[in-house]
A protein has these predicted regions:
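Multi-bladed beta-propeller domains
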Residues: 155-172, 198-216, 242-257, 285-302, ...
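A flexible loop/linker signature enriched in serine peptidases of the S9 family
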Residues: 131, 142-150, 168, 186-195, ...
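Bacterial N-terminal signal peptides
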Residues: 8-17
Length: 394
């Protein structure tokens, strides 16, 4: 890492104390307190942008803001970004403090938007040493007022969206297969909550889990060979694992009310939400079967919807104490969770820095991006209806 944001998330956990208090009506009230000690160097990177037209400038600012940058005058910027966008995008980045040019190049692409995204990713890599997210994709659910919905995919900022399904029924929980060529999701297309595999190249799809009861919450292993899911064929909803095509399902848990499985990036563990001794908790189980282990999340009641970061270090999840909040904790449990922002359904970016999540506003859901280090938030381009249950392609 090459700049002022080269800090580790443990700094955040070390300086936040999360206390759980009970109100007079036994209502859970979450209080976040910050000691006098500094949060660490979590300030955004100051950059200036000059020379581009208004469209490209807006794209660059959006892309960079949700990755920890802020915008100042050239005289006060740590990095100066300049260029042009007449016909194609040309960009140059100068380290004003180091007095050197980091790169200068031109871009080709179908649209100025795609060229601007490519420039953003080069800027992020040149300054931070990390891959950017501007050319990534997301999947999500768009729900109409009648409760039916469709699965959509889009660029990470919500642009260039397209519908994957056209079924006019209840859908949920899109999950990407590796390579961004296919999705798994839950659909009532055949009158039962089944899990479908959908090839995005050919448009073909298969109903891979259509057992008696519910078949929901698909999660694909990092190598794409297996899919975890929640099925209630045996009565209680439990975590199962099957081959990618749905064959040879194997029950992994016998706990109560399991939901929202996700994989560790090494494919060795499955994290999920469950109920033990009448309490909602997060737990993990070996992907090949074995003992269920509870993951402690002190100060964050009713945890659910976990997502394991691609670098293996963090678990983001939703907690509920009256309202829904997004939390992040070390995957090894070495520090308590930190409550970051109001929302639900968090999904990690491929570089384990930004979260996309759903937040409720004005009676519907919108998707927002959160830079975990700086807590900078931006709503993505609104699609149609109510947008929720995002999944980031990795």
């Amino acid at each position: 890492m090459k700049n002022c944001l080269n800090i580790c998330l443990p700094v955040l956990f070390a300086v936040f104390a999360v206390a759980l208090a009970r109100g007079q009506n036994d209502q859970n009230e979450i209080q976040i307190t910050r000691p006098v000690s500094s949060l660490g160097n979590t300030r955004p990177i100051p950059v200036s942008i000059e020379g581009f037209d208004s469209e490209v400038t807006a794209i660059l600012k959006f892309d960079l803001y949700v990755q920890g940058f802020t915008f100042v005058s050239p005289e006060t910027a740590q990095y100066q970004i300049s260029g042009s966008s007449t016909g194609s995008v040309v960009g140059r980045v100068v380290d004003r403090f180091g007095k050197k040019t980091l790169f200068s190049r031109s871009y080709n692409g179908a649209t100025l938007r795609r060229q601007a995204h490519a420039l953003t990713d080069d800027i992020v890599f040149a300054i931070t040493g990390k891959k950017g997210i501007a050319q990534t994709q997301i999947a999500f659910k768009v729900q109409a007022s009648n409760g039916n919905g469709e699965i959509y995919i889009a660029d990470f900022d919500g642009h260039n969206y397209q519908a994957v399904t056209h079924d006019g029924t209840i859908v949920s929980a899109p999950a990407w297969a590796p390579g961004r060529s296919a999705l798994y999701y839950n659909s009532y297309k055949r009158g039962n909550p089944d899990i479908f595999y959908h090839n995005l190249t050919t448009g073909e799809r298969d109903d891979i889990a259509h057992y008696t009861g519910s078949n929901i919450s698909p999660a694909v292993s990092p190598d794409g060979s297996r899919v975890a899911m929640v099925m209630s064929e045996s009565g209680s909803p439990n975590v199962w694992v099957a081959n990618a095509n749905g064959s040879h399902p194997r029950k992994l848990t016998s706990t109560s009310e399991d939901s929202s499985p996700c994989w560790s990036p090494d494919g060795q563990w499955i994290c999920f939400a469950t109920k033990i001794h009448e309490r909602r908790v997060l737990a993990k189980v070996p992907a090949g079967g074995g003992e269920v282990q509870v993951i402690r999340t002190p100060g964050t009641p009713n945890p659910t919807e976990p997502d394991w970061s691609p670098d293996g270090k963090w678990i983001a999840f939703t907690m509920q104490a009256g309202e829904f909040d997004i939390c992040v904790m070390p995957a090894d449990g070495s520090a308590p969770p930190v409550i970051l922002v109001r929302g639900e359904d968090p999904s990690w970016s491929p570089n384990s820095r930004t979260l996309i999540y759903a937040r409720r506003t004005g009676g519907h859901y919108v998707l927002s991006l959160l830079d975990v280090y700086t807590k900078q938030v931006k709503d993505i381009h609104q699609i149609l209806g109510s947008d929720s249950e995002p999944a980031w392609a990795r």
